[in-house]
Amino acid sequence: MDALFRFKHFSVRNTDSALKVGTDAVLLGTVMSIPGHCSRALDIGTGTGVIALIAAQRTEDFREPCHITGIDIDSASAQEAASNFALSPWSDRLQAQCVPLQEFSPGMEFDHIFSNPPYYDRSLRSSELRVSRARHSDTLDFDSLLSHSRSLLAPQGILSLIIPCEIVSDLRRRAASYGLYPFRLVKIRTTDRKFPKRAVVEFSTERVELDTEELTMTRDGVWTPEYSHYVDDFYLKKT
């Protein structure tokens, strides 16, 4: 089996990280907003580093360079992300650290924070502890994620997350208690025959009207134009 997940402009080694490259990560990386003024970004739970790499590609034409830090609690994941970063065209703007968010003290604020967070709460555990820690919210619950993200955000910064649709309302309620308010919600369905199961939700520190969208990935087995708009610059070929 090929150990590399190949994109158009970079490849991701996918062997040591606790969680592998998946649809959720690519969706977040391609769908999330990236502020045009973004000079510092933080990827929480970076895994293989794929979301940070997508963000690096999306910001390569920014007037000011956007430096992206990926952190992960799992040492093998952080090491693999660092290797993937080093082999990418944007190695000078990417770094990985093995550190829990709760202990991360960078001495700076970030214009953009993004995460594909663990959201399984006390559900069936994987037999491998590393995978279980990456998938379950015990080691990084939403309150910790929101409170630490809020403290690390620059005044005009944004937080982008991908989560199951059924927990969006609860997350919005929790976020408000930390002074974070949603400005964009993208509900995502895999096909036009299914209900949305994932959502990209984005927060800022300002109360604004919520922009709600729906994204359908495929129709009759073919990528929809709106999905292609997001992923064409990244995937090698359509599936």
Feature-to-residue mapping (PLM):
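SAM/dcSAM-binding transferase cores
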Residues: 195-239
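Conserved Class I SAM-dependent methyltransferase catalytic core
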Residues: 17, 21, 139-196
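SAM-dependent Rossmann-like transferase core, predominantly class I methyltransferases
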Residues: 2-40, 46-58, 202, 216
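Conserved SAM/SAH cofactor-binding pocket of Class I
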Residues: 30-115, 121-127
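A generic structural signal for alpha->beta connector loops
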Residues: 9, 65, 91-93, 156, ...
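General small-molecule cofactor/ligand-binding pocket signal
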Residues: 13, 69, 95-97, 183-186
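Residue-level signal for inorganic ion chemistry
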Residues: 28, 116, 145, 203
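Mobile active-site "lid"/loop adjacent to the S-adenosyl-L-methionine
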Residues: 117-144
